[in-house]
Structures are given as C-alpha cells and as structure tokens.
Amino acid sequence: MYQVIRPYSVEDKRFTSVTKELLYKCLTLYKAENLIRVGKSNDGGYIISDIGKYDILLSGGIGGDISFEKAFTEKYNTKCVAFDGENIKDSSNVCKNEKNILYVAKNIGDINNDKFTNLKDYLNRFNNIFVKMDIEGGEFPFLYSLTMNELKNIKQMTFEFHFVDIIDKWKILEKISETHYLIHFHANNNNRVVYRYDNIWVPGVFECTYIRKTDLTNIILNDKPLPLDIDNQNTNS
C-alpha cells in the first residue's frame, strides 16, 4: 500500500458553479463484487469488476502499452479494437503480432473522418461492450456526443479523466451517472493538481470504473476505504 499525497491546490472562480450536490452525484461510489486488476501493476493497469462476457473491447490511447488489452482479451475470449492516432509507430509495433487486437490509427472524439472516430459504428452494433480510455482530454467530446442508448450498450467502462475542472465537464460525468454506477475511483499520482470546491478536494486526474446499472444487482454504497490493496501508484516519482 502507498501513501496518498495531497498535491498542489488550484482555485478559480470558474469552478464556483460546481456544487456539492453535483460532486456527490458524480463521485458516489457503489459496491461491486469481484474487483480485479487487469494489466500492469502501475500505469496501464485498471481495476474492473469480473462480471462475465463481452461482445468487444474498445480501447483508446494505447501508446506502447497493451498490457490491459492483452490480459482482457485472453481472460474474456473476446476481440479488441484499439485506437491511437498520436503514437502510431509504437501502437502499430505492439499490436502487429496480436491476433485478438486490431489497431486503428485514429483518435477518438465526437466526429468520424480520416483522423477521428466517434465509435458509433460499434456502439450501435453491440450491446455488451467494454470501453477503456486514456485519451488526454478527448474523453469529454466523445462522451458528450453519445446518446443514452449508446451509453447503455456499454456494459462496463474505465476512463482516465483529465482536469475535470469546470461545470461543463462535471455535467458529462453526471450524464454517465444516469446509466452507470461508479464502482472504483483512483487518483493518478503522476499529476499534482487538485481542485477545491467548497472544501471538497478532487484530484486533477483520476481513473473511474463504471458498471451499467442493469448489471449491478445489489445497489449498496461502497464501504471499503480507498485505495484498495490491488491499487497502485501510476508512477513512483
């Protein structure tokens, strides 16, 4: 287990419209059984609930690390489509010999063109999808673009959220809370920004895992302190 270090604080008048009620709605944590770590022991690994089969894994922002994608596709006997339009060489190299991982040299966003995809082709074709994303802020336009029906086709998802500061970004997390329960939260210690809203401290970068509401049978608030034993630092620095 590691020490949780409070980073530097940032205050700004733009944040004043973010209320306690909104934070509670977005960050209330629910209890899920069978939490496991998939992927590396540090950055690149994620905590998910082991709840069964999936149609497909959609992964965004892989860079040179597919430890999560490899472990996930092997465990659940499924295929992965992995997207990264920034680290094309590294992404192509790590995926080229993987029979279960198809690499696509596009970024994820809210449009479809030769450089971006909004994943709607997949989100409207499958209804038991796992989504994993670390796309450096691109998660906000992508999630904003989704319909509620498209969100409901995602069985489980894990996102790294980057600098959820102003009200518009919190409204996107509120949107997720309409269809999914938050079952894990982990602050990324590779960034030392923290936001303060009326004496509630929120890290600038954090990972969230969500389960579709119809897939969580016992709706109970989490009673385990964070971080969990299977959590780890993103970086040792």
Protein language model features and the residues they cover:
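SAM cofactor-binding core of SAM-dependent methyltransferases
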Residues: 32-114
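Beta-strand cores of modular interaction/reader domains in eukaryotic scaffold and signaling proteins
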Residues: 58, 81, 132, 158-160, ...
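Residues that flank catalytic or metal-binding motifs in active/ligand-binding sites
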Residues: 76, 99, 153, 204-206
